């Protein structure tokens, strides 16, 4: 390679914070863990011609997106592009906003979640949610984890004990907390609180886990632990994660959807999105030229 080409490549790498190299290396490792080819995976969510308004604000426009089971799907895009609105539509949390209205379909396991007869309670049991800020209840760690199972009628202490251990192990935090189960969750670090929230989500045995920027309020070490956990969880769950962190999307996801101005601008395998995007606006965004 000529010296001028080397210099240009180094300049590009600096501009993009090494996104391409991170994506190529890390997603290759991720794909080794995904031994089942995409062609053999079922579609867990199929969004078809979805439009969503907050009053007069047309927040989502003609969204068509198929999300595969046992994948980590990253949703990226600039602020206000519709990322968080989209994942909150997946469990109908958007309906908490009085002015919201929708058109189109979201099929979860082939059933339209907007059907009048579809149970929101059942949907939110099958589809767990982890928010940007850790939000444990002002209760003990034990009571946080057992809240969902108790709500669903489980009262037997032995069964609840087993759920607590299984859930905390699933969130990779059992060894840290097994001797502190009856202390207030507010006394934990931010990273520990977030993993307790993930454990609380696992306690109701969901099929899908939605994560809305789950590490944005965490320190780098806690962020790494949550990312490692996400990789482990995808063996048993389908994970859809909103993130502003391009390197995080490259590290943890199998598929990436780039949202822009309420549209899905591009959706593909993560390594392709980051190393060879089909659209110039996608390339500009992941390269840090806007956002």
Curated annotation (Swiss-Prot):
GO CC list: plasma membrane
Stretches assigned to coiled coil: none
Self-association and partners: The complex is composed of two ATP-binding proteins (PstB), two transmembrane proteins (PstC and PstA) and a solute-binding protein (PstS).
Binding locations of ATP: 77-84
Enzyme Commission no: 7.3.2.1
Topology versus the membrane: Peripheral membrane protein
Record keywords: ATP-binding, Cell membrane, Membrane, Nucleotide-binding, Phosphate transport, Translocase, Transport
Domain of life per record: Bacteria
Record-given protein name: Phosphate import ATP-binding protein PstB
Pfam families for this protein: ABC_tran
GO molecular function: ATP binding; ATP hydrolysis activity; ATPase-coupled phosphate ion transmembrane transporter activity
Protein localization: Cell membrane
Catalysis: reaction(s): phosphate(out) + ATP + H2O = ADP + 2 phosphate(in) + H(+)
Organism the protein comes from: Staphylococcus epidermidis (strain ATCC 12228 / FDA PCI 1200)
């Amino acid at each position: 390679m000529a010296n001028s080409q080397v210099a240009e490549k180094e300049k590009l790498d600096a501009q993009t914070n090494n996104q391409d190299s991170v994506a190529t290396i890390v997603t290759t490792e991720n794909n080794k863990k995904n031994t089942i080819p995409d062609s053999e995976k079922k579609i867990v969510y199929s969004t078809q011609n979805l439009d969503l308004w907050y009053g007069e604000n047309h927040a989502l426009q003609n969204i068509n997106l198929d999300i595969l089971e046992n994948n980590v799907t990253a949703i990226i895009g600039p602020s206000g592009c519709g990322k968080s609105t989209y994942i909150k539509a997946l469990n109908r949390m958007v309906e908490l906003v009085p002015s919201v209205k929708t058109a189109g379909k979201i099929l979860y396991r082939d059933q339209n979640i907007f059907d009048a007869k579809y149970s929101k309670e059942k949907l939110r049991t099958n589809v767990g949610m982890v928010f940007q800020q850790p939000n444990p209840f002002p209760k003990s760690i034990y009571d946080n984890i057992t809240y969902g199972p108790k709500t669903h009628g489980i009262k037997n202490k032995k069964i609840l004990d087993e759920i607590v251990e299984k859930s905390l192990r699933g969130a990779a935090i059992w060894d840290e907390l097994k001797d502190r189960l009856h202390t207030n969750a507010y006394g934990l670090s931010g990273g520990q609180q977030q993993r307790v929230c993930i454990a609380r989500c696992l306690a109701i045995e969901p099929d899908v886990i939605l994560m809305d920027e789950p590490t944005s309020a965490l320190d780098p070490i806690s962020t790494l632990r949550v990312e490692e956990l996400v990789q482990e969880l995808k063996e048993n769950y389908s994970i859809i994660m909103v993130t502003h962190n391009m390197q995080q999307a490259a590290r943890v996801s199998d598929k990436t959807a780039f949202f822009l101005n309420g549209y899905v601008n591009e959706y593909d395998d993560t390594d392709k999105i980051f190393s060879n995007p089909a659209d110039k606006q996608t390339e500009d965004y992941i390269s840090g030229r806007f956002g």
